Structures are given as C-alpha cells and as structure tokens.
C-alpha cells in the first residue's frame, strides 16, 4: 500500500510516516498543501493522510482536488478540532474518513488499512498461491502450513507478488509499491530483499526470476 502523509507539524508527520513504514507501507511525506498537490499529480496513492489546516494550500482544497480528478485515492482527514460540525464538513468536502487530534496510533493504522482495502480491487482475505498463505490483516505468512517470519519489506514484496496472481512484476514496480519515492532507483535493495525472501520461504523456490522483466510467483 502506498500512502502520502500531509502534515505541517514535521515531528508528527515524520512519526506517522515511520509508524506506517513499520507496517510495511510505502510512505511519502510533505509538509504543506502545495507540495501535496504536486505529489498527487505525479504519483498514485492508495491513501492520503491529510491534515486539514495546512499552509500554502488548505487541506480542504487538496481534498477537493482529489475528488475533482476522480482519483481512487482515499482520504483520511486529520484536524485539531473534534467538533461534529467540522467532521461533517470534512466528509462533505470528500474525505472518506476523519480522525481528530490527538489520536491513538493504533487507530490511525486501522483506519488507513480499512481505507486501503476500499481502494484495492477486492481479493480474498487470505491470499494463497504455490503453497503460500498470506494474511494481510494479521500480517502472517505460512508455507505448507508452517509459519514464516518476515521483515516488513519482505512481507510487502511478497504481498505485491501474490496479488499479481502469476503476472510478472518488475523491480521498478516492486520499488514503487513497497518502498517510498526517496529510495534510490538504482539501488539493489529489491534484488537483496527477494534473495532473502526466497531463503526464508525455503525449497522448492516459488519466486521465479524472469530475465529482463522481473519476478513472479
């Protein structure tokens, strides 16, 4: 899942981004509404965590632009006000969900995941292929009935490959979906992660390298 965090309180924005990355999400961060519009114009996001009171361009206008463009991106709006009238106004503007500050991080994670499920093409709750079972909600992976412990990025890469249902996924696509845009496009992090993932999943190998194209399961 790819998420854009838009929050002018930099410490809060960075803390939210760090927490989401620990949940195997690819996260970009900006600190004002103008930068948010720029990112939305060039990148596809599943969810935007959007502070309402932003400098340069107000969060309401960012939300309106997402709706105007007809994007499938879901918006979780944040605000310092918990007034019912503010929540209603935010939802009427086009936000999909609303979370007043201060908030419990566990609730933020749950709401982002719920919005991400609404963005994605409906799939079975548990993904199964080639003897592998992957539960996106419980963050669990099993190979032939035996649980496999994966790091967040390993889980994210495996989930992308499982969701492709046998189609080839390029290294560039994996980099885009499992990492954020600040990752060096010439890095070998995808190859290294796939190698580690293969080792953890055991024999016989289930991740196939398609020379010049990418990987598939």
Swiss-Prot record:
Residues 124-217 bind DNA. GO terms for molecular function: phosphorelay response regulator activity; transcription cis-regulatory region binding. One of its GO terms (biological process) is regulation of DNA-templated transcription. Keywords: DNA-binding, Phosphoprotein, Transcription, Transcription regulation, Two-component regulatory system. It comes from the Bacteria. It holds the Pfam family Trans_reg_C. The modification 4-aspartylphosphate is found at residue 51. InterPro entries: CheY-like_superfamily (IPR011006), OmpR/PhoB-type_DNA-bd (IPR001867), Sig_transdc_resp-reg_receiver (IPR001789), WalR-like (IPR039420), WH-like_DNA-bd_sf (IPR036388). Residues 2-116 form the Response regulatory domain. Transmembrane segments: none annotated. GO terms for cellular component: cytosol; protein-DNA complex. SUPFAM superfamilies: CheY-like (SSF52172). Member of the two-component regulatory system CutS/CutR, involved in the regulation of copper metabolism. CutR suppresses a defective melC1 gene, encoding a putative copper-transfer gene, probably by altering copper metabolism. This is Transcriptional regulatory protein CutR. It comes from Streptomyces coelicolor (strain ATCC BAA-471 / A3(2) / M145).
